[in-house]
UniProtKB/Swiss-Prot annotation:
This is 1-deoxy-D-xylulose-5-phosphate synthase. Gene3D superfamilies: 3.40.50.920, 3.40.50.970. Catalyzes the acyloin condensation reaction between C atoms 2 and 3 of pyruvate and glyceraldehyde 3-phosphate to yield 1-deoxy-D-xylulose-5-phosphate (DXP). Pathway: Metabolic intermediate biosynthesis; 1-deoxy-D-xylulose 5-phosphate biosynthesis; 1-deoxy-D-xylulose 5-phosphate from D-glyceraldehyde 3-phosphate and pyruvate: step 1/1. Mg(2+) binds at D147, N176. It comes from Treponema pallidum (strain Nichols). PANTHER family: 1-D-DEOXYXYLULOSE 5-PHOSPHATE SYNTHASE-RELATED (PTHR43322), 1-DEOXY-D-XYLULOSE-5-PHOSPHATE SYNTHASE, CHLOROPLASTIC (PTHR43322:SF5). Disulfide bonds: none annotated. SMART domains: Transket_pyr.
Amino acid sequence: MDLSLLRSLTGPHDLKSLSPEQVRALAQEVRQEILRVVSANGGHLASNLGVVELTIALHRVFSCPHDVVVWDVGHQCYAHKLLTGRAGRFHTLRQKDGISGFPRRDESPYDAFGTGHSSTALSAASGILSALRYRGKSGKVVAVVGDGALTAGLAFEALLNVGRSCSDLIVILNDNKMSISPNTGSFSRYLSTLTVKGPYQKLKTRLRRALQTVPLVGRPACRALSRLKRSARTLLYQSNIFADFGFEYVGPLNGHHIEDLERVLNDAKKLTRPTLLHVQTVKGKGYPFAEQNPTDFHGVGPFNLAEGIVEKKDALTFTEAFSHTLLNAARTDDRVVAITAAMTGGTGLGLFSHIYPERFFDVGIAEQHAVTFAAGLACAGVKPVVAVYSTFLQRAVDQVIHDVAVQNLPVIFALDRAGAVPHDGETHQGLFDLSILRAVPNINILCPASAHELSLLFGWALAQDTPVAIRYPKALCPPEEDGFSTPVHTGRGVLITRENECNVLLVCTGGVFPEVTAAANTLARKGIFADIYNVRFVKPVDEDYFLDLVGRYRSVLFVEDGVKIGGIAEALQALLNTRHPAPCSDVLAFQDMFYPHGSRAQVLAAAGLSAPHIAARAEWLLAHSVGQIR
Protein backbone atom coordinates (compact mmCIF):
# COMPACT_ATOMS: atom_id res chain seq x y z
CA MET A 1 0.00 0.00 0.00
CA ASP A 2 1.50 3.33 -1.06
CA LEU A 3 1.17 5.91 1.72
CA SER A 4 3.94 8.18 0.51
CA LEU A 5 1.90 11.38 0.67
CA LEU A 6 0.51 10.66 4.12
CA ARG A 7 3.92 9.70 5.48
CA SER A 8 5.50 12.85 4.08
CA LEU A 9 3.25 15.12 6.14
CA THR A 10 4.76 16.67 9.26
CA GLY A 11 1.56 18.52 10.13
CA PRO A 12 -1.58 20.02 8.60
CA HIS A 13 0.36 23.03 7.29
CA ASP A 14 1.92 20.72 4.68
CA LEU A 15 -1.51 20.20 3.12
CA LYS A 16 -1.69 23.75 1.82
CA SER A 17 1.07 23.18 -0.76
CA LEU A 18 -0.46 20.06 -2.32
CA SER A 19 -1.84 20.13 -5.86
CA PRO A 20 -5.47 19.11 -6.51
CA GLU A 21 -4.26 15.75 -7.84
CA GLN A 22 -2.17 15.18 -4.72
CA VAL A 23 -5.09 16.11 -2.49
CA ARG A 24 -7.30 13.50 -4.15
CA ALA A 25 -4.52 10.91 -3.86
CA LEU A 26 -4.08 11.78 -0.18
CA ALA A 27 -7.77 11.18 0.44
CA GLN A 28 -7.39 7.66 -0.90
CA GLU A 29 -4.33 7.04 1.27
CA VAL A 30 -6.15 8.25 4.37
CA ARG A 31 -9.08 5.94 3.63
CA GLN A 32 -6.80 2.96 3.09
CA GLU A 33 -4.97 3.58 6.38
CA ILE A 34 -8.22 3.94 8.30
CA LEU A 35 -9.47 0.67 6.80
CA ARG A 36 -6.22 -1.15 7.56
CA VAL A 37 -6.05 -0.11 11.21
CA VAL A 38 -9.75 -0.37 12.05
CA SER A 39 -10.00 -3.83 10.47
CA ALA A 40 -7.22 -4.92 12.84
CA ASN A 41 -8.14 -3.00 16.01
CA GLY A 42 -11.84 -2.34 15.66
CA GLY A 43 -13.29 1.14 15.94
CA HIS A 44 -15.68 3.59 14.34
CA LEU A 45 -15.36 2.95 10.63
CA ALA A 46 -18.29 4.23 8.56
CA SER A 47 -18.41 7.70 10.09
CA ASN A 48 -14.67 8.21 9.55
CA LEU A 49 -14.73 7.08 5.94
CA GLY A 50 -17.47 9.64 5.31
CA VAL A 51 -15.53 12.74 6.43
CA VAL A 52 -12.12 12.25 4.77
CA GLU A 53 -12.53 14.98 2.14
CA LEU A 54 -14.19 17.32 4.62
CA THR A 55 -11.31 16.88 7.07
CA ILE A 56 -8.69 17.56 4.41
CA ALA A 57 -10.55 20.66 3.25
CA LEU A 58 -10.81 21.97 6.81
CA HIS A 59 -7.09 21.64 7.42
CA ARG A 60 -6.22 23.19 4.05
CA VAL A 61 -8.42 26.23 4.64
CA PHE A 62 -7.91 26.80 8.36
CA SER A 63 -4.65 27.00 10.31
CA CYS A 64 -5.00 24.85 13.40
CA PRO A 65 -4.32 25.20 16.26
CA HIS A 66 -4.54 28.99 15.73
CA ASP A 67 -7.96 28.24 14.29
CA VAL A 68 -10.03 25.75 16.25
CA VAL A 69 -12.04 22.75 15.03
CA VAL A 70 -14.36 21.01 17.51
CA TRP A 71 -15.63 17.56 16.53
CA ASP A 72 -19.02 16.61 17.89
CA VAL A 73 -19.04 13.11 19.45
CA GLY A 74 -15.48 12.83 18.13
CA HIS A 75 -15.65 9.29 16.81
CA GLN A 76 -15.14 10.70 13.28
CA CYS A 77 -11.71 12.17 14.13
CA TYR A 78 -9.45 9.48 12.59
CA ALA A 79 -8.58 11.44 9.44
CA HIS A 80 -7.99 14.48 11.64
CA LYS A 81 -5.52 12.49 13.73
CA LEU A 82 -3.72 11.16 10.66
CA LEU A 83 -3.27 14.69 9.31
CA THR A 84 -2.11 16.26 12.59
CA GLY A 85 1.11 14.40 13.25
CA ARG A 86 -0.20 11.09 14.56
CA ALA A 87 0.06 8.91 11.45
CA GLY A 88 3.12 7.17 12.90
CA ARG A 89 1.14 6.07 15.97
CA PHE A 90 -2.15 5.42 14.25
CA HIS A 91 -1.63 1.64 14.44
CA THR A 92 -2.05 1.97 18.24
CA LEU A 93 -5.58 3.35 17.84
CA ARG A 94 -7.80 2.41 20.84
CA GLN A 95 -5.11 0.13 22.24
CA LYS A 96 -3.69 0.40 25.76
CA ASP A 97 -1.25 3.34 25.92
CA GLY A 98 -2.04 4.13 22.27
CA ILE A 99 -3.91 7.03 20.74
CA SER A 100 -7.55 7.48 21.66
CA GLY A 101 -10.44 6.92 19.29
CA PHE A 102 -11.76 10.33 20.34
CA PRO A 103 -10.26 13.84 20.53
CA ARG A 104 -8.18 14.30 23.66
CA ARG A 105 -6.74 17.64 24.72
CA ASP A 106 -3.85 15.92 26.49
CA GLU A 107 -2.98 13.99 23.32
CA SER A 108 -2.47 16.84 20.86
CA PRO A 109 -2.79 20.64 20.65
CA TYR A 110 -4.90 20.01 17.53
CA ASP A 111 -7.58 18.36 19.69
CA ALA A 112 -9.18 21.54 20.97
CA PHE A 113 -11.95 19.93 23.00
CA GLY A 114 -12.38 16.41 24.32
CA THR A 115 -15.55 14.66 23.22
CA GLY A 116 -17.19 11.24 23.29
CA HIS A 117 -20.87 11.96 23.89
CA SER A 118 -23.07 13.61 21.30
CA SER A 119 -24.28 17.17 20.78
CA THR A 120 -21.69 19.07 22.85
CA ALA A 121 -19.66 20.69 20.05
CA LEU A 122 -21.87 23.73 19.44
CA SER A 123 -21.82 24.78 23.09
CA ALA A 124 -18.10 24.10 23.46
CA ALA A 125 -17.16 25.89 20.24
CA SER A 126 -19.30 28.86 21.21
CA GLY A 127 -17.53 29.06 24.56
CA ILE A 128 -14.09 28.82 22.96
CA LEU A 129 -14.95 31.55 20.47
CA SER A 130 -16.33 33.84 23.17
CA ALA A 131 -13.16 33.39 25.23
CA LEU A 132 -10.92 34.14 22.25
CA ARG A 133 -12.77 37.34 21.45
CA TYR A 134 -12.87 38.39 25.10
CA ARG A 135 -9.10 37.98 25.29
CA GLY A 136 -8.60 39.93 22.08
CA LYS A 137 -7.42 36.95 20.04
CA SER A 138 -8.15 36.22 16.41
CA GLY A 139 -8.75 32.81 14.91
CA LYS A 140 -11.82 31.13 13.53
CA VAL A 141 -13.77 28.45 15.39
CA VAL A 142 -15.51 25.61 13.55
CA ALA A 143 -17.92 23.06 15.01
CA VAL A 144 -18.43 19.86 13.01
CA VAL A 145 -21.81 18.40 13.95
CA GLY A 146 -23.65 15.38 12.60
CA ASP A 147 -27.29 15.53 11.62
CA GLY A 148 -28.05 12.95 14.29
CA ALA A 149 -26.59 15.22 16.97
CA LEU A 150 -29.17 17.88 16.16
CA THR A 151 -31.90 15.65 17.57
CA ALA A 152 -30.58 16.46 21.06
CA GLY A 153 -31.93 19.41 23.00
CA LEU A 154 -28.43 20.57 23.99
CA ALA A 155 -27.60 21.24 20.34
CA PHE A 156 -30.71 23.37 19.88
CA GLU A 157 -29.98 25.32 23.06
CA ALA A 158 -26.59 26.18 21.59
CA LEU A 159 -28.00 27.05 18.15
CA LEU A 160 -30.41 29.52 19.71
CA ASN A 161 -27.67 31.19 21.75
CA VAL A 162 -25.12 31.29 18.93
CA GLY A 163 -27.59 32.78 16.46
CA ARG A 164 -28.62 35.41 18.99
CA SER A 165 -25.01 36.33 19.85
CA CYS A 166 -24.10 37.34 16.27
CA SER A 167 -20.69 35.67 16.67
CA ASP A 168 -18.74 34.45 13.66
CA LEU A 169 -18.92 30.77 14.57
CA ILE A 170 -18.86 28.38 11.62
CA VAL A 171 -20.99 25.26 11.97
CA ILE A 172 -20.56 22.38 9.56
CA LEU A 173 -23.60 20.13 9.50
CA ASN A 174 -22.35 16.72 8.40
CA ASP A 175 -25.55 15.26 6.98
CA ASN A 176 -25.12 11.53 6.36
CA LYS A 177 -28.71 10.60 7.24
CA MET A 178 -27.36 8.59 10.18
CA SER A 179 -26.40 8.99 13.82
CA ILE A 180 -25.63 5.37 14.68
CA SER A 181 -28.91 3.89 13.66
CA PRO A 182 -30.72 5.68 10.80
CA ASN A 183 -32.00 9.06 11.91
CA THR A 184 -35.59 9.40 12.98
CA GLY A 185 -37.96 12.25 13.71
CA SER A 186 -39.27 15.35 12.04
CA PHE A 187 -35.94 17.20 12.06
CA SER A 188 -34.28 14.45 10.03
CA ARG A 189 -37.13 14.69 7.52
CA TYR A 190 -36.77 18.47 7.52
CA LEU A 191 -33.10 18.30 6.56
CA SER A 192 -33.96 16.19 3.54
CA THR A 193 -36.14 19.03 2.22
CA LEU A 194 -33.38 21.65 2.37
CA THR A 195 -32.08 21.95 -1.17
CA VAL A 196 -30.39 24.88 -2.80
CA LYS A 197 -29.55 24.48 -6.46
CA GLY A 198 -25.88 24.41 -7.40
CA PRO A 199 -26.04 27.27 -9.94
CA TYR A 200 -27.59 29.53 -7.30
CA GLN A 201 -24.85 28.73 -4.80
CA LYS A 202 -22.12 29.39 -7.38
CA LEU A 203 -23.73 32.64 -8.50
CA LYS A 204 -24.06 33.84 -4.90
CA THR A 205 -20.42 33.01 -4.17
CA ARG A 206 -19.13 34.74 -7.32
CA LEU A 207 -21.24 37.84 -6.67
CA ARG A 208 -20.02 38.12 -3.08
CA ARG A 209 -16.40 37.75 -4.17
CA ALA A 210 -16.79 40.38 -6.86
CA LEU A 211 -18.40 42.87 -4.51
CA GLN A 212 -15.73 42.36 -1.84
CA THR A 213 -13.04 43.48 -4.27
CA VAL A 214 -14.66 46.90 -4.67
CA PRO A 215 -12.84 49.42 -2.41
CA LEU A 216 -14.81 51.03 0.45
CA VAL A 217 -18.28 50.01 -0.69
CA GLY A 218 -17.75 46.30 -1.36
CA ARG A 219 -18.34 44.86 2.12
CA PRO A 220 -21.29 47.18 2.96
CA ALA A 221 -22.83 46.18 -0.36
CA CYS A 222 -22.44 42.49 0.56
CA ARG A 223 -24.22 43.09 3.86
CA ALA A 224 -27.02 45.02 2.16
CA LEU A 225 -27.43 42.27 -0.43
CA SER A 226 -27.60 39.65 2.33
CA ARG A 227 -30.34 41.62 4.12
CA LEU A 228 -32.25 42.01 0.86
CA LYS A 229 -31.94 38.29 0.17
CA ARG A 230 -33.30 37.39 3.61
CA SER A 231 -36.22 39.79 3.17
CA ALA A 232 -37.06 38.35 -0.23
CA ARG A 233 -36.81 34.81 1.07
CA THR A 234 -39.18 35.66 3.92
CA LEU A 235 -41.73 36.94 1.41
CA LEU A 236 -41.36 34.32 -1.30
CA TYR A 237 -40.11 31.07 0.20
CA GLN A 238 -40.74 28.70 3.04
CA SER A 239 -38.68 29.53 6.12
CA ASN A 240 -35.28 27.92 6.76
CA ILE A 241 -34.88 27.04 10.43
CA PHE A 242 -31.16 27.84 10.52
CA ALA A 243 -31.69 31.24 8.94
CA ASP A 244 -34.46 31.87 11.44
CA PHE A 245 -31.98 31.09 14.22
CA GLY A 246 -29.70 33.81 12.83
CA PHE A 247 -27.31 31.75 10.73
CA GLU A 248 -26.14 32.33 7.19
CA TYR A 249 -27.18 29.01 5.65
CA VAL A 250 -25.16 27.56 2.77
CA GLY A 251 -25.91 24.23 1.19
CA PRO A 252 -26.41 21.44 0.73
CA LEU A 253 -22.87 20.81 -0.53
CA ASN A 254 -21.23 17.64 -1.80
CA GLY A 255 -19.05 16.60 1.13
CA HIS A 256 -16.75 14.56 -1.10
CA HIS A 257 -15.84 17.35 -3.54
CA ILE A 258 -12.78 18.94 -1.95
CA GLU A 259 -12.49 21.92 -4.32
CA ASP A 260 -16.09 23.02 -3.70
CA LEU A 261 -15.69 22.55 0.04
CA GLU A 262 -12.54 24.65 0.10
CA ARG A 263 -14.15 27.42 -1.92
CA VAL A 264 -17.14 27.68 0.40
CA LEU A 265 -15.02 27.38 3.56
CA ASN A 266 -12.82 30.23 2.36
CA ASP A 267 -15.92 32.34 1.82
CA ALA A 268 -17.25 31.44 5.27
CA LYS A 269 -14.00 32.62 6.86
CA LYS A 270 -14.75 36.15 5.68
CA LEU A 271 -18.23 36.37 7.19
CA THR A 272 -18.82 38.15 10.49
CA ARG A 273 -22.04 36.37 11.44
CA PRO A 274 -22.82 32.76 12.36
CA THR A 275 -22.62 30.49 9.33
CA LEU A 276 -23.94 26.98 8.84
CA LEU A 277 -22.58 24.89 5.98
CA HIS A 278 -24.85 21.96 5.18
CA VAL A 279 -22.55 19.21 3.90
CA GLN A 280 -23.92 15.92 2.61
CA THR A 281 -21.65 12.89 2.99
CA VAL A 282 -21.92 9.15 2.52
CA LYS A 283 -21.30 7.12 5.64
CA GLY A 284 -18.78 4.39 4.79
CA LYS A 285 -17.60 6.18 1.62
CA GLY A 286 -15.05 4.18 -0.36
CA TYR A 287 -15.67 0.80 1.28
CA PRO A 288 -18.64 -0.92 -0.37
CA PHE A 289 -19.49 -3.13 2.60
CA ALA A 290 -19.75 -0.07 4.87
CA GLU A 291 -21.67 1.99 2.30
CA GLN A 292 -24.24 -0.80 1.96
CA ASN A 293 -24.52 -1.43 5.70
CA PRO A 294 -23.34 1.66 7.61
CA THR A 295 -25.09 0.67 10.84
CA ASP A 296 -23.10 -2.55 11.22
CA PHE A 297 -19.89 -0.73 10.34
CA HIS A 298 -20.47 2.22 12.66
CA GLY A 299 -18.71 0.77 15.69
CA VAL A 300 -17.11 -2.50 14.70
CA GLY A 301 -14.72 -5.09 16.09
CA PRO A 302 -11.83 -6.52 14.08
CA PHE A 303 -13.03 -7.74 10.69
CA ASN A 304 -11.91 -9.37 7.46
CA LEU A 305 -11.15 -6.41 5.23
CA ALA A 306 -11.41 -8.28 1.93
CA GLU A 307 -14.76 -9.88 2.72
CA GLY A 308 -16.27 -7.35 5.13
CA ILE A 309 -16.98 -10.10 7.67
CA VAL A 310 -16.83 -9.17 11.35
CA GLU A 311 -15.28 -11.71 13.71
CA LYS A 312 -18.04 -13.37 15.72
CA LYS A 313 -17.83 -15.03 19.13
CA ASP A 314 -19.57 -18.35 19.66
CA ALA A 315 -20.71 -17.48 23.18
CA LEU A 316 -23.72 -15.31 23.94
CA THR A 317 -23.15 -11.67 24.88
CA PHE A 318 -25.13 -9.92 27.59
CA THR A 319 -26.62 -7.65 24.93
CA GLU A 320 -27.86 -10.69 23.01
CA ALA A 321 -29.18 -12.25 26.22
CA PHE A 322 -31.15 -9.07 26.93
CA SER A 323 -32.51 -9.10 23.37
CA HIS A 324 -33.82 -12.66 23.78
CA THR A 325 -35.21 -11.89 27.23
CA LEU A 326 -37.09 -8.81 26.01
CA LEU A 327 -38.58 -10.69 23.06
CA ASN A 328 -39.78 -13.48 25.33
CA ALA A 329 -41.37 -10.94 27.65
CA ALA A 330 -43.08 -9.16 24.75
CA ARG A 331 -44.60 -12.41 23.51
CA THR A 332 -46.36 -13.01 26.82
CA ASP A 333 -47.12 -9.42 27.87
CA ASP A 334 -48.48 -7.00 25.29
CA ARG A 335 -47.82 -4.07 27.63
CA VAL A 336 -44.06 -4.35 27.04
CA VAL A 337 -42.63 -1.66 24.76
CA ALA A 338 -39.00 -0.70 24.04
CA ILE A 339 -37.31 2.69 23.72
CA THR A 340 -33.85 3.56 22.43
CA ALA A 341 -31.98 6.80 21.82
CA ALA A 342 -30.53 6.11 18.35
CA MET A 343 -28.89 2.86 19.51
CA THR A 344 -31.15 0.17 18.08
CA GLY A 345 -28.38 -2.25 17.16
CA GLY A 346 -26.01 -1.43 20.01
CA THR A 347 -28.61 -2.10 22.69
CA GLY A 348 -29.89 -5.30 21.10
CA LEU A 349 -33.26 -3.97 19.94
CA GLY A 350 -32.87 -4.71 16.24
CA LEU A 351 -34.95 -7.88 16.20
CA PHE A 352 -37.55 -6.39 18.53
CA SER A 353 -37.96 -3.39 16.20
CA HIS A 354 -38.69 -5.72 13.25
CA ILE A 355 -41.06 -8.06 15.07
CA TYR A 356 -42.91 -5.38 17.05
CA PRO A 357 -42.54 -2.11 15.11
CA GLU A 358 -45.65 -0.64 16.74
CA ARG A 359 -44.13 -1.27 20.19
CA PHE A 360 -40.69 0.14 19.38
CA PHE A 361 -39.66 3.79 19.73
CA ASP A 362 -36.36 5.25 18.53
CA VAL A 363 -36.37 8.85 19.76
CA GLY A 364 -33.01 9.85 18.26
CA ILE A 365 -30.06 11.09 20.30
CA ALA A 366 -32.37 12.39 23.01
CA GLU A 367 -31.88 10.49 26.26
CA GLN A 368 -33.72 13.11 28.30
CA HIS A 369 -36.77 12.82 26.07
CA ALA A 370 -36.48 9.01 26.08
CA VAL A 371 -36.78 8.83 29.87
CA THR A 372 -39.65 11.29 30.22
CA PHE A 373 -41.39 9.70 27.23
CA ALA A 374 -41.10 6.38 29.08
CA ALA A 375 -42.57 8.01 32.18
CA GLY A 376 -45.56 9.11 30.13
CA LEU A 377 -46.00 5.62 28.72
CA ALA A 378 -45.89 4.15 32.22
CA CYS A 379 -48.56 6.61 33.38
CA ALA A 380 -50.83 5.26 30.64
CA GLY A 381 -50.52 1.62 31.67
CA VAL A 382 -47.77 0.13 29.51
CA LYS A 383 -44.41 -1.34 30.61
CA PRO A 384 -41.66 0.74 28.98
CA VAL A 385 -38.12 -0.63 28.77
CA VAL A 386 -35.49 2.05 28.13
CA ALA A 387 -32.42 0.35 26.64
CA VAL A 388 -29.43 2.65 26.97
CA TYR A 389 -25.69 2.49 27.55
CA SER A 390 -24.77 3.15 31.17
CA THR A 391 -22.64 6.15 30.19
CA PHE A 392 -25.48 7.73 28.22
CA LEU A 393 -27.98 7.45 31.07
CA GLN A 394 -25.87 10.15 32.73
CA ARG A 395 -27.35 12.55 30.18
CA ALA A 396 -30.83 12.05 31.65
CA VAL A 397 -30.30 11.85 35.41
CA ASP A 398 -32.73 14.68 36.16
CA GLN A 399 -35.46 12.95 34.16
CA VAL A 400 -34.81 9.67 36.00
CA ILE A 401 -35.23 11.45 39.32
CA HIS A 402 -37.89 14.07 38.55
CA ASP A 403 -40.10 12.26 36.06
CA VAL A 404 -39.72 8.59 37.00
CA ALA A 405 -38.54 8.14 40.58
CA VAL A 406 -40.51 10.92 42.27
CA GLN A 407 -43.70 9.51 40.74
CA ASN A 408 -42.56 5.93 41.41
CA LEU A 409 -43.40 4.87 37.86
CA PRO A 410 -42.73 1.31 36.62
CA VAL A 411 -40.06 2.09 34.03
CA ILE A 412 -37.35 -0.53 33.42
CA PHE A 413 -33.88 0.76 32.54
CA ALA A 414 -31.74 -1.81 30.72
CA LEU A 415 -28.23 -0.45 31.25
CA ASP A 416 -25.87 -1.95 28.69
CA ARG A 417 -22.08 -1.41 28.80
CA ALA A 418 -22.10 -1.13 32.60
CA GLY A 419 -18.74 -1.34 34.35
CA ALA A 420 -15.51 -1.56 32.36
CA VAL A 421 -16.04 -0.82 28.66
CA PRO A 422 -13.36 -1.87 26.16
CA HIS A 423 -11.42 0.52 23.90
CA ASP A 424 -13.55 3.69 24.03
CA GLY A 425 -11.93 5.22 27.09
CA GLU A 426 -12.94 7.70 29.75
CA THR A 427 -16.14 8.99 28.19
CA HIS A 428 -17.65 5.55 27.69
CA GLN A 429 -16.84 3.66 30.90
CA GLY A 430 -20.04 2.66 32.69
CA LEU A 431 -18.73 3.25 36.19
CA PHE A 432 -21.08 5.81 37.74
CA ASP A 433 -24.55 4.30 37.39
CA LEU A 434 -24.56 2.43 40.70
CA SER A 435 -23.42 5.40 42.77
CA ILE A 436 -25.85 7.76 41.03
CA LEU A 437 -28.90 5.50 41.18
CA ARG A 438 -28.28 4.20 44.72
CA ALA A 439 -28.91 7.73 45.98
CA VAL A 440 -32.33 7.96 44.29
CA PRO A 441 -35.38 6.79 46.29
CA ASN A 442 -37.81 4.23 44.83
CA ILE A 443 -35.38 2.74 42.26
CA ASN A 444 -34.48 -0.95 42.44
CA ILE A 445 -31.04 -1.85 41.03
CA LEU A 446 -30.20 -5.35 39.79
CA CYS A 447 -26.90 -6.86 38.60
CA PRO A 448 -27.30 -10.24 36.84
CA ALA A 449 -24.23 -12.42 36.52
CA SER A 450 -25.40 -14.64 33.63
CA ALA A 451 -27.91 -14.89 30.80
CA HIS A 452 -30.31 -17.03 32.84
CA GLU A 453 -30.07 -14.71 35.82
CA LEU A 454 -30.76 -11.75 33.53
CA SER A 455 -33.95 -13.48 32.43
CA LEU A 456 -35.01 -14.20 36.03
CA LEU A 457 -34.33 -10.67 37.22
CA PHE A 458 -36.07 -9.13 34.20
CA GLY A 459 -39.15 -11.18 35.02
CA TRP A 460 -39.00 -9.87 38.59
CA ALA A 461 -38.69 -6.31 37.25
CA LEU A 462 -41.78 -6.66 35.06
CA ALA A 463 -43.81 -7.68 38.09
CA GLN A 464 -42.94 -4.51 40.00
CA ASP A 465 -44.89 -1.26 40.13
CA THR A 466 -41.73 0.77 40.76
CA PRO A 467 -38.69 1.78 38.66
CA VAL A 468 -36.04 -0.89 38.10
CA ALA A 469 -32.55 -0.60 36.64
CA ILE A 470 -30.86 -3.76 35.36
CA ARG A 471 -27.17 -3.33 34.54
CA TYR A 472 -24.88 -5.68 32.62
CA PRO A 473 -21.46 -5.42 30.96
CA LYS A 474 -20.23 -5.43 27.39
CA ALA A 475 -18.96 -8.98 27.73
CA LEU A 476 -19.69 -12.61 27.00
CA CYS A 477 -22.08 -14.34 29.37
CA PRO A 478 -20.21 -16.76 31.67
CA PRO A 479 -21.19 -20.43 32.03
CA GLU A 480 -24.25 -20.93 34.18
CA GLU A 481 -23.81 -21.88 37.84
CA ASP A 482 -26.32 -24.00 39.74
CA GLY A 483 -27.06 -21.07 42.02
CA PHE A 484 -28.14 -18.84 39.14
CA SER A 485 -31.46 -20.69 38.88
CA THR A 486 -32.30 -19.84 42.50
CA PRO A 487 -35.69 -18.08 42.64
CA VAL A 488 -35.52 -14.34 43.11
CA HIS A 489 -35.99 -13.06 46.66
CA THR A 490 -36.14 -9.29 46.95
CA GLY A 491 -32.94 -7.87 48.40
CA ARG A 492 -31.06 -11.17 48.42
CA GLY A 493 -28.30 -12.54 46.27
CA VAL A 494 -27.03 -16.03 45.53
CA LEU A 495 -24.35 -17.91 47.47
CA ILE A 496 -22.08 -20.14 45.38
CA THR A 497 -20.56 -22.55 47.90
CA ARG A 498 -17.59 -24.92 47.81
CA GLU A 499 -17.50 -28.44 49.22
CA ASN A 500 -14.76 -27.55 51.67
CA GLU A 501 -15.22 -25.38 54.73
CA CYS A 502 -14.49 -21.80 53.67
CA ASN A 503 -13.01 -18.94 55.65
CA VAL A 504 -13.23 -16.40 52.83
CA LEU A 505 -16.31 -14.84 51.26
CA LEU A 506 -16.03 -12.96 47.97
CA VAL A 507 -18.99 -10.59 47.55
CA CYS A 508 -19.44 -9.26 44.01
CA THR A 509 -21.69 -7.49 41.55
CA GLY A 510 -22.68 -9.54 38.51
CA GLY A 511 -20.37 -7.84 36.01
CA VAL A 512 -17.21 -9.11 37.72
CA PHE A 513 -18.48 -12.59 38.61
CA PRO A 514 -16.13 -14.28 36.07
CA GLU A 515 -13.08 -12.53 37.54
CA VAL A 516 -14.16 -13.42 41.08
CA THR A 517 -14.74 -17.05 40.06
CA ALA A 518 -11.28 -17.23 38.49
CA ALA A 519 -9.81 -15.73 41.67
CA ALA A 520 -11.58 -18.34 43.80
CA ASN A 521 -10.14 -21.09 41.60
CA THR A 522 -6.65 -19.61 42.01
CA LEU A 523 -7.09 -19.58 45.79
CA ALA A 524 -8.36 -23.17 45.78
CA ARG A 525 -5.16 -24.32 44.08
CA LYS A 526 -3.33 -22.87 47.09
CA GLY A 527 -5.61 -24.64 49.55
CA ILE A 528 -7.61 -21.51 50.36
CA PHE A 529 -11.31 -22.03 49.76
CA ALA A 530 -13.68 -19.14 49.13
CA ASP A 531 -17.42 -18.91 48.72
CA ILE A 532 -18.88 -16.38 46.31
CA TYR A 533 -21.90 -14.21 47.04
CA ASN A 534 -23.40 -12.69 43.89
CA VAL A 535 -25.42 -9.79 45.29
CA ARG A 536 -28.07 -9.67 42.52
CA PHE A 537 -29.67 -6.70 44.31
CA VAL A 538 -27.70 -3.52 44.74
CA LYS A 539 -30.90 -1.93 46.00
CA PRO A 540 -32.77 -2.90 48.08
CA VAL A 541 -30.61 -5.08 50.33
CA ASP A 542 -32.01 -7.52 52.88
CA GLU A 543 -29.67 -6.36 55.64
CA ASP A 544 -30.57 -8.99 58.24
CA TYR A 545 -30.07 -11.79 55.73
CA PHE A 546 -26.74 -10.36 54.63
CA LEU A 547 -25.41 -9.88 58.17
CA ASP A 548 -26.37 -13.42 59.10
CA LEU A 549 -24.61 -14.73 55.99
CA VAL A 550 -21.29 -12.90 56.38
CA GLY A 551 -20.99 -13.78 60.04
CA ARG A 552 -19.84 -17.28 59.05
CA TYR A 553 -16.53 -16.07 57.56
CA ARG A 554 -13.21 -14.80 58.90
CA SER A 555 -12.69 -12.41 55.99
CA VAL A 556 -14.95 -10.78 53.42
CA LEU A 557 -13.73 -9.13 50.21
CA PHE A 558 -16.17 -6.91 48.31
CA VAL A 559 -15.61 -6.61 44.54
CA GLU A 560 -17.63 -4.10 42.49
CA ASP A 561 -17.46 -3.01 38.83
CA GLY A 562 -18.38 0.59 39.62
CA VAL A 563 -16.75 3.48 41.42
CA LYS A 564 -15.99 2.88 45.08
CA ILE A 565 -17.40 6.23 46.23
CA GLY A 566 -21.10 5.74 46.85
CA GLY A 567 -21.07 2.18 45.56
CA ILE A 568 -22.68 -0.96 46.97
CA ALA A 569 -19.37 -2.46 48.14
CA GLU A 570 -18.62 0.52 50.33
CA ALA A 571 -22.17 0.44 51.71
CA LEU A 572 -22.09 -3.29 52.46
CA GLN A 573 -18.73 -2.97 54.19
CA ALA A 574 -20.16 -0.21 56.39
CA LEU A 575 -23.13 -2.46 57.16
CA LEU A 576 -20.78 -5.34 57.96
CA ASN A 577 -18.83 -3.19 60.40
CA THR A 578 -21.97 -2.69 62.49
CA ARG A 579 -21.70 -6.35 63.43
CA HIS A 580 -19.65 -7.10 66.54
CA PRO A 581 -17.24 -8.66 66.12
CA ALA A 582 -16.99 -7.96 62.39
CA PRO A 583 -15.03 -10.14 59.96
CA CYS A 584 -11.91 -8.60 58.45
CA SER A 585 -12.98 -6.91 55.21
CA ASP A 586 -11.81 -4.82 52.27
CA VAL A 587 -13.22 -3.28 49.08
CA LEU A 588 -11.98 -3.57 45.50
CA ALA A 589 -13.68 -1.13 43.12
CA PHE A 590 -12.85 1.61 40.65
CA GLN A 591 -11.01 4.47 42.30
CA ASP A 592 -11.63 8.22 42.08
CA MET A 593 -10.18 8.70 38.60
CA PHE A 594 -11.09 8.34 34.93
CA TYR A 595 -9.90 5.14 33.27
CA PRO A 596 -8.40 5.33 29.76
CA HIS A 597 -8.96 3.03 26.82
CA GLY A 598 -7.81 -0.56 26.61
CA SER A 599 -9.37 -4.00 26.44
CA ARG A 600 -11.91 -4.87 29.12
CA ALA A 601 -9.34 -7.09 30.82
CA GLN A 602 -6.79 -4.27 30.78
CA VAL A 603 -9.24 -1.76 32.25
CA LEU A 604 -10.17 -4.19 35.03
CA ALA A 605 -6.50 -4.86 35.73
CA ALA A 606 -5.78 -1.13 35.92
CA ALA A 607 -8.44 -0.89 38.63
CA GLY A 608 -7.14 -3.92 40.54
CA LEU A 609 -10.17 -5.99 39.55
CA SER A 610 -8.47 -8.77 37.58
CA ALA A 611 -8.55 -12.33 38.91
CA PRO A 612 -4.87 -12.24 40.06
CA HIS A 613 -5.47 -8.96 41.92
CA ILE A 614 -8.61 -10.30 43.60
CA ALA A 615 -6.93 -13.56 44.62
CA ALA A 616 -3.89 -11.76 46.02
CA ARG A 617 -6.02 -9.35 48.04
CA ALA A 618 -8.21 -12.15 49.39
CA GLU A 619 -5.13 -14.11 50.45
CA TRP A 620 -3.66 -11.05 52.17
CA LEU A 621 -6.96 -10.34 53.89
CA LEU A 622 -7.22 -13.88 55.23
CA ALA A 623 -3.66 -13.71 56.56
CA HIS A 624 -4.55 -10.54 58.47
CA SER A 625 -7.75 -12.02 59.86
CA VAL A 626 -5.97 -14.47 62.17
CA GLY A 627 -7.60 -14.28 65.57
CA GLN A 628 -10.92 -13.05 64.22
CA ILE A 629 -13.83 -14.66 66.07
CA ARG A 630 -16.25 -16.43 63.73
